[in-house]
Amino acid sequence: MIPVTELRYFADTQPAYRILKPWWDVFTDYISIVMLMIAVFGGTLQVTQDKMICLPCKWVTKDSCNDSFRGWGASSPEPTYPNSTVLPTPDTGPTGIKYDLDRHQYNYVDAVCYENRLHWFAKYFPYLVLLHTLIFLACSNFWFKFPRTSSKLEHFVSILLKCFDSPWTTRALSETVVEESDPKPAFSKMNGSMDKKSSTVSEDVEATVPMLQRTKSRIEQGIVDRSETGVLDKKEGEQAKALFEKVKKFRTHVEEGDIVYRLYMRQTIIKVIKFFLIICYTVYYVHNIKFDVDCTVDIESLTGYRTYRCAHPLATLFKILASFYISLVIFYGLICMYTLWWMLRRSLKKYSFESIREESSYSDIPDVKNDFAFMLHLIDQYDPLYSKRFAVFLSEVSENKLRQLNLNNEWTLDKLRQRLTKNAQDKLELHLFMLSGIPDTVFDLLELEVLKLELIPDVTIPPSIAQLTGLKELWLYHTAAKIEAPALAFLRENLRALHIKFTDIKEIPLWIYSLKTLEELHLTGNLSAENNRYIVIDGLRELKRLKVLRLKSNLSKLPQVVTDVGVHLQKLSINNEGTKLIVLNSLKKMVNLTELELIRCDLERIPHSIFSLHNLQEIDLKDNNLKTIEEIISFQHLHRLTCLKLWYNHIAYIPIQIGNLTNLERLYLNRNKIEKIPTQLFYCRKLRYLDLSHNNLTLLPADIGLLQNLQNLAVTANRIEALPPELFQCRKLRALHLGNNVLQSLPSRVGELTNLTQIELRGNRLECLPVELGECPLLKRSGLVVEEDLFSTLPPEVKERLWRADKEQA
């Protein structure tokens, strides 16, 4: 038989699952153990003890055995003797009962009477108890074994225990009691002035962008509050980060269904039904457990008797055990009914962390549903502290704090200094790409002037940005940045340039329209939708000091607000990504414009409204599908125009009126289809930069020598066969790009270009280089772009001088 100490195995599940067992499951498990003990004890007795003890009955009346024999009287019926083959003599009194049966006959009679005459309930009582108990245990533990539920439960318990023991949980919960209040020393010096400014930041954002007064809350505008976090070591931080990812994936997976809830409900219903079934038939049949049993069997031919009186030795004990078993089943059933009532009364497929949100600083802990909610309800019956500690890993605020700590551990001050570079404007720049946030050490780079944030989700700009007193330029590329009120107050006074690139309107922080001192704004993204234009563009009216506006989008027409801010704009740049831009008459109002860029706007012709902008100094009409530029005659009214860019178009010829642009200093006509250069072009005597590369030119006119101020000439990728001698009269030439033409030779007069620093000759038909290249004192080997075999045709002393010039520069 099974030892009693091993019975617990049938009721115990994995030790880790104990936290999923409410008090009622614990009670029913122990009741099941007692039931098992009853079954094992009864079964053991039944196997080891005599099941039935039978004796033949000599005095039988109507197949019933009389307890004693009395003499026959006149009034007494005459007894019969079916069990005896020899009738007793009436006048001989009995002095005792003697049976002529041996031991084997008695054993046979016991077995036959036990099998045929003992009631089935008394016979199988221990086995019924064992069967019902095993069914109860199976119902209680099936959800721990069924693959579709056990996997979820195992995963849940594993994550829950790790969250409970995580150092991050303890630190996060401790912040709800004690908040760190010591600000950084460098920032504390500015608190006196910054606090006053930040107190009105939220109101100013709403005031400057009227549409926000109705639709945007303080949080939606990206203005948030912040508290300092503790410190974890790197290993603990990485472990906590992994836990956050596991919790996210587990929540997504478990909230999809409610199979755990439904299976637990069905288990409970089955146990309740089983309870009623057991009570009904057990109470009904328990009285059939009797000590005395009359047994009438047709075995007279084997034993000589037909009727026997039998004793069931275990009847009294079985009756006691049955009564005890019934009481246990009643207690078990009441618990199951309470469980069912608990499940039906409460909404167990929803779990709210409302109380935890009120007690802690993590007000963003979400409510959960379905199986996730049900398992948390079960955990609360075991110990509510588990849910409280687990909730920390459901909070995005908590995750952001942890992410910030890990980020600070990874990005030390020395590592950030190694990432500092000088940009084209010679400003000290830091580019952070695809990080989880902004490392706090960034704000210790006091020399920083330009900060680029790209693909950084949910970044929050802290007050410590005020330490960067030299910061004047901020880039937000696909970065939906929030900002704290003190930080916004600082940027309002100090930020001068802002670059924003977005694909979704939500990536544009609305607080940018409160930057009163902003002078330069670059917006790159889709503004074709009407609501996008309204939200993004409309706020520009409040940027009164804006001088430079760059829009890279796909507008169909110039928004009215651009015209409104254009009164004080000095530079307007629109890159329309190939979408046709129409209705440009409003440009006339931008009287203060000095630079205008209309790139990829599919204009086809030069807009007439440009000619009214008398302060224009630079015009860029790149890639606009221009085929003719006859309107260029009107440019003569733009007396301040010094730079004209008509590159990347389909221009076939240059109008002779180009000569009227006498103040022109830079002219870009590259990437067109020009075949001839008019003489009038060389009347622009102030030209310093002329780019005619990638056209269809076959020669350069001799009048090019009139451009005495020319410093850079580019005619790369044409079909020029020879260079006019007059070209070398342009003594100020510093760069000469002649690559990919069909030049047969390079004139020796090239040595007269004493200011030449770069000459490109690659891709021509030259056989040798003139020795006079050595007479260009500023020319170096790196500035001579030519095939290596062609370079080898120069005399050794010339090559040596060119190489030496490179080394001296290095």
UniProtKB/Swiss-Prot annotation:
LRR repeats: from-to residues: 399-422, 423-445, 447-468, 469-492, 493-515, 518-542, 543-565, 567-589, 590-613, 614-637, 639-661, 662-684, 686-707, 708-730, 732-753, 754-776, 778-801
Positions occupied by motif Di-leucine motif: 706-707
Subcellular compartments: Cell membrane; Lysosome membrane
Chain ranges on the Extracellular side, renumbered to this chain: 48-123, 287-316
Membrane topology qualifier: Multi-pass membrane protein
Keywords linked to the UniProt accession: Acetylation, Cell membrane, Differentiation, Disulfide bond, Glycoprotein, Ion channel, Ion transport, Leucine-rich repeat, Lysosome, Membrane, Phosphoprotein, Repeat, Spermatogenesis, Transmembrane, Transmembrane helix, Transport
Regulation (activators, inhibitors): Inhibited by (4-[(2-butyl-6,7-dichloro-2-cyclopentyl-2,3-dihydro-1-oxo-1H-inden-5-yl)oxy]butanoic acid), which plugs the channel like a cork in a bottle by binding in the extracellular selectivity filter and sterically occluding ion conduction. Lipids may block conduction in closed heterohexameric channels.
Single annotated GO MF: identical protein binding
Catalytic activity from the UniProt record: chloride(in) = chloride(out); iodide(out) = iodide(in); taurine(out) = taurine(in); L-aspartate(out) = L-aspartate(in)
Positions where Phosphoserine occurs in the chain: S202, S217
Sequence positions bearing N-acetylmethionine: M1
Residue positions where Phosphothreonine is found in the record: T200, T215
Pfam families (UniProt xref): LRR_14, LRR_8, Pannexin_like
SMART domains with a match to the protein in the record: LRR_SD22, LRR_TYP
Side of membrane Cytoplasmic, spans: 1-22, 143-264, 342-810
Disulfide bonds: C54-C310, C57-C65, C113-C295
Family classification: Belongs to the LRRC8 family.
Note on domains (UniProt): The volume-regulated anion channel (VRAC) channel forms a trimer of dimers, with symmetry mismatch between the pore-forming domain and the cytosolic LRR repeats, a topology similar to gap junction proteins.
Assembly notes: Heterohexamer; oligomerizes with other LRRC8 proteins (LRRC8B, LRRC8C, LRRC8D and/or LRRC8E) to form a heterohexamer. Can form homohexamers in vitro, but these have lower conductance than heterohexamers. Detected in a channel complex that contains LRRC8A, LRRC8C and LRRC8E. In vivo, the subunit composition may depend primarily on expression levels, and heterooligomeric channels containing various proportions of the different LRRC8 proteins may coexist. Interact with GRB2. Interacts with NOX4; this interaction prevents the ubiquitin-mediated degradation of LRRC8A.
Name assigned to this protein: Volume-regulated anion channel subunit LRRC8A
Organism placement in taxonomy: Eukaryota, Metazoa, Chordata, Craniata, Vertebrata
UniProt gene name: Lrrc8a
